[in-house]
């Protein structure tokens, strides 16, 4: 896989559900189609919530790193 070029970062470390998803929704709304967002999170609920959010909102979850905290998610904004 080629290197992912991150255009925005969202740090949700220390926040618990539903705050990470609320901030993700707000942040991605102000991004341009095709931009990539890196999310840092330590809430275990994000391992379920972020992939579901991406599928529901038609964004592309490019990669996730769930081995250690903080969890990392790379999301490419869809239409």
Swiss-Prot record:
InterPro entries: Sulphur_carrier_TusA, TusA-like, TusA-like_sf
Cellular localisation: Cytoplasm
Gene3D superfamilies the UniProt entry points to: TusA-like domain
Protein name (record): Sulfur carrier protein TusA
UniProt-listed HAMAP family: Thiourid_synth_A
Organism field: Histophilus somni (strain 129Pt) (Haemophilus somnus)
KW Cytoplasm (keyword) present: yes
Chief localisation class: cytoplasm
